[in-house]
Amino acid sequence: MNQEVIAKRYASALFQIALEQGQLDRIEEDVPAVRQALAENGEFLSLLSYPKLSLDQKKALIREAFAGASTPVQNTLLLLLERHSFGLVPELAEQFLALVDDARGIAKAVAYSARRLTDEELRALSDVFAQKVGKQTLEIENIIDPELIGGVNVRIGNRIYDGSVSGQLERIRRQLIG
């Protein structure tokens, strides 16, 4: 089974537990912290895959390292360890945070532009496109693309809205030909 699909199942389960226990905010803080701690400490991951350590010893290491994390997060980490799926933590974190954003009516977008967009322009884009995709808020990351002549391309999920000058010229060209 695809690793992304498996991670999404764990993320969905953790999300449901967070909702049921009223700990969504706490777990939303814990998940990125765990992901970052693991990303910054490769030795810890190596230690967890060390064959001479027993499962109980590895569990003790996780409990100690993540003692400050909520119980559902600790239990998820322990379950991933037991099922030899600890490498899914980064993808699980991404999936979990996407579920939280979705529940809060937030979508992520990338705006490609020839120049840096002002805060006002980003707010205007957010307002227009949030409404288009049925979300309350659109968090936009602005990436400067020197290939663009002008205008903006906005990517939300797997959809691209082409508002670039070159895109407009291409549409005009097709209308004239066709």
Curated annotation (Swiss-Prot):
GO cellular component: plasma membrane; proton-transporting ATP synthase complex
Keyword set includes Membrane: yes
Entry membrane topology: Peripheral membrane protein
Keyword Transport attributed: yes
One Gene Ontology molecular-function label: proton-transporting ATP synthase activity, rotational mechanism
Keywords: ATP synthesis, Cell membrane, CF(1), Hydrogen ion transport, Ion transport, Membrane, Transport
Subcellular location: Cell membrane
PROSITE patterns assigned: ATPASE_DELTA (PS00389)
InterPro entries linked to this entry: ATP_synth_OSCP/delta_N_sf, ATPase_OSCP/d_CS, ATPase_OSCP/dsu
Main location per the UniProt record: membrane
Signal peptide (from-to): none
NCBIfam families for this protein: ATP_synt_delta (TIGR01145), PRK05758.2-4 (NF004403)
Membership in a protein family: Belongs to the ATPase delta chain family.
Oligomeric form and interacting partners: F-type ATPases have 2 components, F(1) - the catalytic core - and F(0) - the membrane proton channel. F(1) has five subunits: alpha(3), beta(3), gamma(1), delta(1), epsilon(1). F(0) has three main subunits: a(1), b(2) and c(10-14). The alpha and beta chains form an alternating ring which encloses part of the gamma chain. F(1) is attached to F(0) by a central stalk formed by the gamma and epsilon chains, while a peripheral stalk is formed by the delta and b chains.
Function: F(1)F(0) ATP synthase produces ATP from ADP in the presence of a proton or sodium gradient. F-type ATPases consist of two structural domains, F(1) containing the extramembraneous catalytic core and F(0) containing the membrane proton channel, linked together by a central stalk and a peripheral stalk. During catalysis, ATP synthesis in the catalytic domain of F(1) is coupled via a rotary mechanism of the central stalk subunits to proton translocation. This protein is part of the stalk that links CF(0) to CF(1). It either transmits conformational changes from CF(0) to CF(1) or is implicated in proton conduction.
Identification of the protein by name: ATP synthase subunit delta
Organism encoding this protein: Bacillus caldotenax
Gene: atpH
